[in-house]
Amino acid sequence: MSDFQREQRKNEHVEIAMAQSDAMHSDFDKMRFVHHSIPSINVNDIDLTSQTPDLTMAYPVYINAMTGGSEWTKNINEKLAVVARETGLAMAVGSTHAALRNPRMAETFTIARKMNPEGMIFSNVGADVPVEKALEAVELLEAQALQIHVNSPQELVMPEGNREFVTWLDNIASIVSRVSVPVIIKEVGFGMSKELMHDLQQIGVKYVDVSGKGGTNFVDIENERRANKDMDYLSSWGQSTVESLLETTAYQSKISVFASGGLRTPLDAIKSLALGAKATGMSRPFLNQVENNGIAHTVAYVESFIEHMKSIMTMLDAKNIDDLTQKQIVFSPEILSWIEQRNLNIHRG
């Protein structure tokens, strides 16, 4: 594939993603908090700091991996980096393969660090990149963490995608052992299982982003790029973010879990934190805001989002993220069926 074709693919991904809409039905709507009428705290008591063994984020919300590798996506990364700088959010860039392959593309990613020199930035590579390239990806952005995206459904629907996956787990293990910053194993919208969590724990992984279905749909994106558009029947493949978080419960004391995939509102973010996530990521909401409404409007959107999270936590009488995990939740029969059939041991406070 030529550099021009790769740039074109990056732009196509963004165009199709922006045209997608949220899923009509979300598993976040299949779980409810139990309301208690009189909080014992005030809004100003709320501490939204997200603390993990290696990363401290001012807020448990981050701009998740999206793009880079073309002039248009450089402009997007520049604007998102300004939003991150002005709001204190962490930010992940999209796959840096283009920059690692062609130095001319490096600026489409490094613009994020240029615009946000003191901020927290996650670099991003695929599960098949050599260790040396993973190290380069971290150095390129002076990144505080490295996402490794695992995206086999996307690759298999992508006309020019990868068809070989046997080495992925061993390669991830090698990267984890060599890279000095936290390595986050990130799905891309298909969710995670307890079996995967077991395998990742065995190779020393300490961070995952479950990225469940319900948000940006890469099966749909790649199917749109197929000549016959003949794999649309896989559109609903995978676990939701709620199901994925429930799958991780037994591993949350050993692996820091981040949640993304289909988060629409501050309430969805709070529900994710209550299910054990340490932080929540969103992509398309930020992309649409910054492209359609500009930087200032997106900054205001983030500030409002954070304030709404504080209001919800006050209603729940939860001073911090840890308190949220002790709050009572009622699940729908469908979610309870998933828990039962998957033999998940879920204990609520």
From Swiss-Prot:
Family: Belongs to the IPP isomerase type 2 family.
Residues bound to FMN: 65-67, 95, 124, 186, 211, 216, 262-264, 283-284
Role: Involved in the biosynthesis of isoprenoids. Catalyzes the 1,3-allylic rearrangement of the homoallylic substrate isopentenyl (IPP) to its allylic isomer, dimethylallyl diphosphate (DMAPP).
Catalysed reactions, as listed in the record: isopentenyl diphosphate = dimethylallyl diphosphate
Cofactor requirements of the protein: FMN; NADPH; Mg(2+)
Quaternary structure and interacting proteins, as annotated: Homooctamer. Dimer of tetramers.
Location in the cell: Cytoplasm
Cellular component terms per the entry's GO annotation: cytoplasm
Residues noted as binding Mg(2+) in the record, renumbered to the chain: 155
Gene: fni
A GO MF label: isopentenyl-diphosphate delta-isomerase activity
Provenance organism: Staphylococcus aureus (strain bovine RF122 / ET3-1)
Protein's name in the database: Isopentenyl-diphosphate delta-isomerase
Keyword annotations from UniProtKB, A to Z: Cytoplasm, Flavoprotein, FMN, Isomerase, Isoprene biosynthesis, Magnesium, Metal-binding, NADP
Pfam families documented for this protein: FMN_dh (PF01070)
GO BP: isoprenoid biosynthetic process
Main location: cytoplasm
Source species, domain of life: Bacteria
InterPro entries recorded: Aldolase_TIM, FMN-dep_DH, IPdP_isomerase
CDD domains with a match to the protein in the record: IDI-2_FMN
Enzyme Commission number: 5.3.3.2
Positions annotated to bind substrate: 9-10, 95-97, 154
